[in-house]
């Protein structure tokens, strides 16, 4: 059914939207790599060394440096369809709070990244309310804010922060 297909879950193949094999933009994958990527050596292999002892010289020699927290564990949850629409953000936030669905929040995520948002959404919309509830439980939220381009081409005037960044 449609409801089953819309249920957020770990995505084993986050680049499977387009039939040409090039993915659908890869924004979430890119953000995950920035946050917790291992890094890629000059010969194209995954870096498997000790991050605490990684020297500046070694880092400069890498094709892609490691993310900010390369030893972090990630729970990747797709909330957007292939063309950018979603009705499952709240279900995804429920999953962040209780990944195995057993009602025990002790296994919740420590941080949630929401590289998404909308303009002009009220601060009391369901997503913002959930973000505030999660904060009270100790979940730190990082959300997109003010990056919806400029207003009518007027210089450096950029959009305000909509939901969920205005939580």
Feature locations, PLM:
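Sequence contexts marking disulfide-bonded cysteines in secreted/extracellular proteins
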Residues: 16-18, 95, 156
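Well-ordered alpha-helical segments embedded in enzymatic catalytic cores
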Residues: 88-95, 126, 130
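Generic anion/oxyanion-binding catalytic loop in active/binding sites
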Residues: 20, 101, 116
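Subtilisin-like serine protease catalytic core
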Residues: 1-88, 104-110, 123, 135-138, ...
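Catalytic-core segments of hydrolase enzymes
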Residues: 105-167
